[in-house]
Regions:
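Conserved N-terminal segment of class I S-adenosyl-L-methionine
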Residues: 5-76, 80-107
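A conserved beta-strand element that flanks and buttresses the S-adenosyl-L-methionine
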Residues: 118
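Short catalytic micro-motifs in class I SAM-dependent methyltransferases
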Residues: 121-122
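Short alpha-helix
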Residues: 155-168
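Core SAM-dependent methyltransferase catalytic element
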Residues: 179-192
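Conserved beta-strand signature within the Rossmann-like core of class I S-adenosyl-L-methionine
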Residues: 143-151
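A short glycine-rich, Lys/Arg-flanked "PGG" loop and its adjoining helix->strand segment in the class I
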Residues: 130-142
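Conserved S-adenosyl-L-methionine
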Residues: 170-180
């Protein structure tokens, strides 16, 4: 009779845990794909994941972590930041991967440099979106990109983003929109 070593037992348990985590993640992603608003958000992450630069990405305002999970297929290192402890806890439980670091500590972002920064549906919820764009722009590597999305109804953001890009020398690389409803669209822009 073959006895199982502690190491073999640990590896079997780890494999079951990882498989369970991945299955949960895929179940959540399937639910997201069925929701019109969240599906539009998913498309923004898919576009950012298709970027040519594939080293480090910051998912600022990562929420529950599903966008970071999508980005982790295309980038060597993903930092998912959100100030909400409950959301970060959920992300760590359901969307953990070796190449993802979820944090709620904004101080950890200081001094780091990223190839891509994603700000999907974040700017309408921050007090000073121009200041946040300026701060995050300094975290970009020289050839980096910032991907931004917001609802078309948030027209004031267009002025803030345009002013920021002109002051900081960022150029609009691409822009698109996707319908959420008869009245609303998600606007997506990439600056480099």
């Amino acid at each position: 009779m073959h006895s199982i070593s502690r190491m073999e037992c640990w590896l079997v348990c780890l494999c079951k845990e990882v498989r369970g985590t991945m299955e949960k993640a895929m179940q959540y992603l399937d639910l997201i794909r069925k929701d019109p608003f969240l599906h539009a958000m998913l498309a923004s992450y898919d576009n950012a994941a298709a970027a040519q630069v594939q080293d480090c990405v910051l998912d600022y305002g990562c929420g529950y972590g599903w966008g970071s999970y999508i980005l982790s297929d295309s980038f060597r290192h993903v930092t998912g930041y959100d100030p909400d402890a409950e959301r970060i806890s959920f992300a760590r439980r359901h969307f953990a991967r070796k190449n993802i670091a979820f944090t709620q500590d904004g101080g950890l972002l200081a001094g780091r440099r990223y190839d891509v920064i994603c700000l999907f549906m974040v700017l309408p919820y921050v007090e000073d979106s121009g200041e946040l764009l300026a701060r995050l722009g300094m975290c970009l590597k020289p050839e980096g990109f910032i991907w931004i999305s917001y609802k078309s109804a948030d027209t004031a953001l267009l002025t803030v983003i345009k002013s920021w890009s002109q002051q900081r020398g960022f150029v609009l690389a691409c822009s698109s929109s996707r319908r959420l409803s008869d009245r609303e669209e998600v606007v997506e822009q990439c600056y480099g």
